[in-house]
Amino acid sequence: MKRLILIIIVCCRALGWCHANTQTETDSLYRVAQSLPHDSTRLEMFKRLAQIEQLTPRCITFSGLLREEATLQKNDRYNTIAAYLHTVYYYNQNNRDSVKKWLDTMEPYARKSQTWDLYFDALRFQIDLCTYEEQYELAINEANLMYERAQKVNCARGLIGAKQCLGNVYISTERWDEGMKALEAAYQLSLQTDNAVVRISILCQLISITKDQKNNQLLSEYLAKLKETLHHHTSTNPMLKEAFYDVYLFCEVYYTYYYLYAGQPEQAHKNLVKAGKFLNGNTFFLYRVLYYDAYAAYFRACKAYDRALAKIDSTIILLQEDFNSNYIHQKLTKADLLAEAGRSAEAIPLYIETLHLKDSIETTVLDKQMQQIKAKYNIDKVALEEERLKSYIQLGTLIVVVIILIILVAFMLRIS
């Protein structure tokens, strides 16, 4: 579930901007906004409206109103925020081109207002979408460039985000040690800031890795840190608790795995029941996938194969629109369950079908990576040739200057 986790983590970053989403509240606040004077209170109200609606198309409407008002008031900071909210919406739609468009719009405003935190958060959305689309080489290159840019403007959030992006790529390509190293570096950097949402997102990434590696000791440590950070943040900001329901669900789901690995299925079931309490109409579908997947693991541990298969089928239905590695992983898990249940006649054709699909996707991914490497090589080669040409021009200019100086010296000597 590596690529699935990736999308969940970045959504976690956007949660700091989220509030309870009710149509009544939105309509009420919009009426208030229309009566406000053209000052910072009006800007704040449009920002809040866009935050509330960030998962719906109305986010674009309110972000657009915020942008118009910020332009009218010549406020670069709120223009940055308006562009950022556009990137949040389009990120949730997996629309990398639109994220890029609004990043380009955001940059000059971020530079003028020095709101680099938001800019680098949005840049991270773009890079993580590259990883989600399996453009790994591009994501690595962009993450390294992001780190360099963040260093130049001394932006801690940018440094953290770049390390997280690298961690995501390494997780997705099963380079576990490099992924852990990058994310640990990000976590240590996050301790130097007061941004709890950033720490929560990093801890979720570390939890996903330690779960995949079945390192129960580290899984327990990171879960405890996540629980503490989440509790402190929502206690300090009680209005945000509902906005963090998906993260609470995430925490309980991964406690389920901790207890399953520890051989305590009864306790694991208690955590699943707790997780279910955080499901609602606004639950992002990938969190539902995580929830059903954990339930399948629980039923599998109890050898209740029919119930486990039903849960796996639920995840396959949710993921079937995009035949990616998550979809394949779930199909293979279903084949494993059928085999364990003694239904080999059903398992074997499913193994064959899924492995063919896996080979096809891996070949496509490999081709993408090779094209990216070749493209980077050609770009680097062109840049090298340009540098060589510049060197030749500079050398030629220097030779001409030296010749002129020699002629001048000779002329002066002749005169004297």
Identify the residue ranges that each predicted region occupies:
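Structural signature of alpha-solenoid helical repeat scaffolds
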Residues: 37, 74, 114, 154, ...
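"A position-specific structural signal for the A-helix of alpha-solenoid helical repeats
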Residues: 48, 85, 118, 125, ...
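Hydrophobic positions within repeat-based interaction scaffolds
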Residues: 24-39, 60, 97, 306, ...
